Amino acid sequence: MDLHRQTEPETEHEAILSVRGVSVSFGAQTVLDGLDLDVRRGEILGFVGASGAGKSVLLRTVLGLNRKQAGTIRMFGKDIEAITPDERLAVDMKMGVLFQHGALFSALTVRENILIPMREYLDLPQRLMDELALLKLDLVGLSAAAADKFPSQLSGGMIKRAALARALALDPEIVFLDEPTSGLDPIGAADFDELIAKLRDTLGLTVYMVTHDLDSLFSVCDRIAVLGGKKVLAVGPISAMLAHDDPWIRSYFRGKRARQIAMPEQMPNAEMYS
C-alpha cells in the first residue's frame, strides 16, 4: 500500500524545526560539521545515512541530550538555547519521542508508562489521566487490555505501539521516531507505517523519522534527508533521491532491494539500473 504524499513547494511551508550550521564533536572526533536541515510542519521526513554517520547524534542534539559546539537549533521559531525555562517547558510539551527499542520502563505497566509525561508536565486528576491513557492506546491500535500489562508481556509490535502512545501523551505537534520499524516483521512494519501516516493525517502531526527501512521511505515519507560527510547531502521527495547523482544516494535508492520495493512509476527507466 503506497501511503506516500507529496508536499507542496517549500515556500508554502513553515519550518517547525530549523537546524543551521550545527557541529557536534566528541573529543577529537567531529560527527556533524555545519549541518543545515528544515523540517516542515505537517510532513513526514525520513532521515537516512550510513551506519555511524550521525543520525542518532543529530536527533539527540535536537532533543537537548547532546551538546553542540556550533550552530543554532530553532523549534517552533525559538532558539532552544536562548529561551526562558518556561518557554523551554512549552517547547518540550509540543514534542514526543519514540526511541528505537521503545524504552518502556520494565517495572511499570503500559498505563503507568504513558502517564509519565502527564505526571511530569500536567496537573490533572488521576482518573482523568487514566482515561487519557486508554484513549492514547486506542489511538495507536491497542486495546484497553494492554494497559495493565508489563513490557515483558508484549510483542515487539505492541511495545512499539505502547511507546508511541506515550510519545503522544501530551498531544505533541511533532514526534521524533528513531528506527520505528526496527525489529518488526514485514507485516508489522507495514502496519506501523500505515499507523504513522494515519496519525499524521488525522492529528496534523509533523514526523521526523530516523530509519533504514526502504519500505517506509518509499511509502510514507513526504521528503527524505540524506546524511553523509557530516552534513545533509540532499533533501527532497523520493523522486529526487532516485534522480540524484551522488554515488551513495544512487546505491541506496537504486540498489537491488530498492528496485524490488519501488513502484514502477517511482523508478523510471528502471532498466538503466539493472
Name each model-derived stretch.
Residues 71-79, 91:
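Conserved ABC transporter NBD signature motif
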Residues 79, 127-145:
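Conserved ABC ATPase "signature" region
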Residues 48-50:
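The feature captures the beta-strand-to-loop junction immediately N-terminal to the Walker
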Residues 169-173:
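A short, proline-enriched helix->beta-strand linker immediately N-terminal to the Walker B motif
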Residues 63:
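Helix-to-loop junction immediately C-terminal to a conserved catalytic motif
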Residues 150-154, 158:
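Conserved ABC ATPase signature
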Residues 175-178:
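Catalytic Walker B motif of ABC-type/P-loop ATPase nucleotide-binding domains
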